[in-house]
Amino acid sequence: MEVDPSSSLPGAGEGGGGGIGGGGGDLWPFDSLTTSLLFSSVSASPQPLPASSSSWLTPPSPLWLFDERQLLPLDMGAPAAPATAPPAEAAAVVEEVHRTRSGNSDTTSKRVDQINSKWQFHLSIDDNTDSSCLFKERLTQALRYFKESTDQHLLVQVWAPVKSGDRYVLTTSGQPFVLDQQSIGLLQYRAVSMMYMFSVDGENAGELGLPGRVYKQKVPEWTPNVQYYSSTEYPRLNHAISYNVHGTVALPVFDPSVQNCIAVVELIMTSKKINYAGEVDKVCKALEAVNLKSTEILDHPNVQICNEGRQSALVEILEILTVVCEEHKLPLAQTWVPCKYRSVLAHGGGVKKSCLSFDGSCMGEVCMSTSDVAFHVIDAHMWGFRDACVEHHLQKGQGVSGKAFIYRRPCFSKDISQFCKLEYPLVHYARMFGLAGCFAICLQSMYTGDDDYILEFFLPPNCRNEDDQNALLESILARMKKCLRTLKVVGNGDTNEVCLQISNVLIIETEDLKTNVHFENSEGCFRESPESNGSQRVHEVDNDGNKVSIMSERHLLADDNSQNNGASVGRPNGSGASDSLHKSNKPPERRRGKAEKTISLDVLQQYFSGSLKNAAKSLGVCPTTMKRICRQHGISRWPSRKINKVNRSLSKLKQVIESVQGSDAAFNLTSITGPLPIPVGPSSDSQNLEKASPNKVAELSNLAVEGDRDSSLQKPIENDNLAILMSQQGFIDANNNLQLEADKASHSRSSSGEGSINSRTSEASCHGSPANQTFVCKPIASTFAEPQLIPEAFTKEPFQEPALPLSRMLIEDSGSSKDLKNLFTSAVDQPFLARSSNLALMQNSGTVTIKASFKEDIVRFRFPCSGSVTALKDEVAKRLRMDVGMFDIKYLDDDHEWVKLACNADLEECMEISGSHVIRLLVSDVAAHLGSSCGSSG
């Protein structure tokens, strides 16, 4: 909820905001006025702070205390506690609280408890009492301690309650904060955060936001990247994208003397963070130094195996995980068990039971932990996800493992990244690591009786096709049958065992979420439509092979959907969720399967001239489904991408031919434009061209090359000479050979990947730069002939230049161009008329200008066209003061997608596609690869 502070904050001008910066722990001279003036010129997205408003310049910073036992809803029949205590009682409370903090005597603590049980009261900074001001002083000192203990670049800010009208909201305006002076983005995000207020007792996600959820539930919440949230879950999402904010953790702050939550500490950073244990530990120690508390965190000690039976069970489980992962190349498999309880601080002072994770939200409820039990990792990249699992826990019904635990049946989900955070607390990490298919099964051992062991297997990230997933699942089940000795599959009800058949697996569908959610890449942002409802379907395959729908709806927050039309978000880990199963014999509607059956090849051909994404949008399917439909029709690659590549080859060949004196009269080339008239099969386009008859080849003059994706296609260029030229077999072979030579340095783009998708993270890194705007490489026809510079005769036939003396003009490209140059040494060397082609100018100059963006930094330097990727990375690393190997470089391809530069062939194609002497690149951090290739504990 975004609230205008000028209309809601009382007592303006009575308190001052402070911050902690570098240099001896001195407070930064940041108040609301200074910050607003600093960023009054910030771009319109997000909106700048209102510099002219005087009513919010220095809002008060109250901290409030209340006893939960007396906190009654306003609409309840019972009389509510008075908003403020009488003066005498309030004075007594202040005196007792102050005395308690000084001596911590049992007598004074009991006195405070007695007053708390009688009155609901609020202590504010603006009442000028020593006790109320002490809250802010202690928080400020705690942040000083934290600043001294960390060297990370981050923003730490405090959210504290303030009265707005007749209710209380959380605000960070006027509260202490720690800020890295080097990060302008975090400073801007701090200024934006001061404009927000969040409810302390709201009933929907939009009102609560991240600070409100943490304050209300009194448990931490964290994510590797806030851009995985929806805008409902995280109202500051657009600002986070604009200012390159990623990792965030929010912790409740308790005052043990009054047993209440008094504030929320939020840690914000511009890098993606997987493990927050170190930061949380430092915050907790800093708070303890000033007699405040937060969620405790302990190192995870190895579980002591107290009997041989448990040890034998874990050894057998480890064997199963290892065999299945190694045989089927699964990236990760792990075990969840009902967690061991320990005592932690809960609700500010009460001792409750919690699991080993530092979340601390289970409060004695049944939950599962994956720490210190058997697991197996094959893909080293998944160690980060494994570490995140250790820090989290799952309650009954959360994630695939939680559902296997509560349903007592094997469960499978085709795409766990489609869950909401409430249904699967690890969903942000699943999106970050590109995980999709997941299978879980609950086992018991004859050695340990009723002890449950939930085995969780993650399918390879590239295994997303439904048929491939089903085949792999069947193979996993068959292998597990052979491995089970003392372990048995947990049955449902009176059934002791469930046969390991795919017909007995519960298929967890999230179709309601799929229709409203999409991701821009495997690491990209979360987007949702307003109508998403957060329900999900569970399908059971009966003995006849038919799916039985089991609807499992989570009624988590009353009237949430009706009031907010957003995803319900209550407790971050879903402890308030309740499962209700409604069985139905009616098979569920599968929108994706229906679309696949109805989209024919004839329909697809109508969209071949445009981009795949635009075609998918027009047909009402996602790009992934569109690619699957193409594969079913034998189309391995979207045609317009191939046409673009052929056109680039034609342009090269044209320049080679023109370098021979008098060749302009004999040859006339043009790009391939117009709608695609011939079916595209599994064979390559070049083979189709070779086999095509002269009449069919003549029709190719009307083929269209994809231009600007958001603009209309260019008019077909008519050229009769193309049919004559293209009908000759020799030209086809020459064209293919030239392309082969240009691509021989591993030009398959395996590392670039046509599936690479433009992430909002990447766009945010380039915010404000031209590369972030709609910049798409134009077709060769237009890049070689700018309309405003070329005569009318040239625009009609873009590749036919005026009959002027020609000199040698060859592109120094991969091998073939240099070799061909030697064939024309006898050509007359005459002055060459400079073309309008940016590509030609770039190659003639021998150098290009590189503009590389990294977070808020942009570096610019000249680079030789013949340089290698290694040399390019060295130049970037030297200027950004980074280590080579710790970052990736990406370029914007002709589909407006950020593609990784992995080899010299990618760099060559980048220069081809750019068509300009200025090449813009994006530099991003490499995800941490932790640990070795496999491991286990038990």
Curated annotation (Swiss-Prot):
<keyword id="KW-0804">Transcription</keyword>
<feature type="region of interest" description="Disordered">
    <location>
        <begin position="743"/>
        <end position="769"/>
    </location>
</feature>
<feature type="compositionally biased region" description="Gly residues">
    <location>
        <begin position="12"/>
        <end position="26"/>
    </location>
</feature>
<dbReference type="GO" id="GO:0003677">
    <property type="term" value="F:DNA binding"/>
</dbReference>
<dbReference type="InterPro" id="IPR055081">
    <property type="entry name" value="NLP1-9_GAF"/>
</dbReference>
<dbReference type="GO" id="GO:0005634">
    <property type="term" value="C:nucleus"/>
</dbReference>
<feature type="compositionally biased region" description="Low complexity">
    <location>
        <begin position="748"/>
        <end position="762"/>
    </location>
</feature>
<feature type="domain" description="PB1">
    <location>
        <begin position="847"/>
        <end position="926"/>
    </location>
</feature>
<feature type="domain" description="RWP-RK">
    <location>
        <begin position="585"/>
        <end position="666"/>
    </location>
</feature>
<keyword id="KW-0238">DNA-binding</keyword>
<dbReference type="InterPro" id="IPR034891">
    <property type="entry name" value="PB1_NLP"/>
</dbReference>
<keyword id="KW-0805">Transcription regulation</keyword>
<feature type="region of interest" description="Disordered">
    <location>
        <begin position="557"/>
        <end position="597"/>
    </location>
</feature>
<dbReference type="Pfam" id="PF00564">
    <property type="entry name" value="PB1"/>
</dbReference>
<dbReference type="Pfam" id="PF02042">
    <property type="entry name" value="RWP-RK"/>
</dbReference>
<comment type="function">
    <text>Probable transcription factor.</text>
</comment>
<dbReference type="InterPro" id="IPR000270">
    <property type="entry name" value="PB1_dom"/>
</dbReference>
<keyword id="KW-0175">Coiled coil</keyword>
<dbReference type="Pfam" id="PF22922">
    <property type="entry name" value="GAF_NLP"/>
</dbReference>
<feature type="compositionally biased region" description="Basic and acidic residues">
    <location>
        <begin position="580"/>
        <end position="597"/>
    </location>
</feature>
<dbReference type="GO" id="GO:0003700">
    <property type="term" value="F:DNA-binding transcription factor activity"/>
</dbReference>
<feature type="region of interest" description="Disordered">
    <location>
        <begin position="1"/>
        <end position="26"/>
    </location>
</feature>
<protein>
    <recommendedName>
        <fullName>Protein NLP3</fullName>
    </recommendedName>
</protein>
<dbReference type="InterPro" id="IPR045012">
    <property type="entry name" value="NLP"/>
</dbReference>
<keyword id="KW-0539">Nucleus</keyword>
<feature type="coiled-coil region">
    <location>
        <begin position="640"/>
        <end position="662"/>
    </location>
</feature>
<dbReference type="InterPro" id="IPR003035">
    <property type="entry name" value="RWP-RK_dom"/>
</dbReference>
<dbReference type="InterPro" id="IPR053793">
    <property type="entry name" value="PB1-like"/>
</dbReference>
